[in-house]
């Protein structure tokens, strides 16, 4: 929004700063961070008053989780509000990729909000039917994938970019749309499954968001793509504003979500942030790299899939409990130990993902 003020700039005033992407990215980060610090405590107090008993705790979960009873959920509202406000304030609103990612984030956030609301109201862990959430998510992802394909340059519209190879593209035809749908919905649900311990999901999301922000900046810069041998997608650099706001809002939330958490992210936050990561990957044509950068989320999701399929087939379990972070809890690992080690893994995977820009 503030970018429009550059029209009134003569090149020598403060409005000229708004032309620079890096300046606006930094401003978006601090705007979201300050927003989170200012409104975090009032929101938590409001949620505690409205929710009473807070988020229901699974009866079959680790015994240590019963001490968390009464903790309010829907903390993702803090991330979403700071993210949306900051992005609208600092991003160019004539950029289609900004709107695609922003609308996907809000739409999945609404799905998560409905699920959290149902859980709190019924005081059970069921919430909205998984099938209903999945179908609505597919519809949102289909619209986003189609919009992204429409916004891409003609030579990239239905292409899948391959990492580690210079300008390597695979033409998926119209299979690109269902593929992109799987990426967006899969990312949303994978982050949702990861959000099971205090601080576990938000830091890997911020790490992945930072990585995708760098990738978006590179992919949207012709000189950098020409040097690195990466496909050029004009306009994606503006997504750096979104990812900067995501990290700022995420840090503001982590201030209150750090163990012992004063508030849980809930599906409101996890589905929204996962959907955002998937949408950014689709817009930047880095869907495969997302699987590397978000390898922790992929592992969490696969642990659930493997557990369910193996149990249905044999009546036995591969893991003591799924998702896999609960398996380590059952083995006696302390919660902070699991969280920090998973953060380290996320950072390593992010560095590997970034290396794909150069290793070609």
Swiss-Prot record:
GO biological process annotation, one example: peptidoglycan biosynthetic process
Record field: transmembrane: 27-47, 71-91, 93-113, 134-154, 168-188, 199-219, 239-259, 262-282, 288-308, 337-357
Taxonomy, superkingdom: Bacteria
Keyword Magnesium found: yes
InterPro entries listed in its UniProt record: Glycosyl_transferase_4 (IPR000715), PNAcMuramoyl-5peptid_Trfase (IPR003524), PNAcMuramoyl-5peptid_Trfase_CS (IPR018480)
Any coiled-coil regions, as ranges: none
PANTHER family according to UniProt: PHOSPHO-N-ACETYLMURAMOYL-PENTAPEPTIDE-TRANSFERASE, PHOSPHO-N-ACETYLMURAMOYL-PENTAPEPTIDE-TRANSFERASE HOMOLOG
Protein name per UniProt: Phospho-N-acetylmuramoyl-pentapeptide-transferase
Classification lineage: Bacteria, Pseudomonadati, Pseudomonadota, Alphaproteobacteria, Rhodobacterales
Primary gene name: mraY
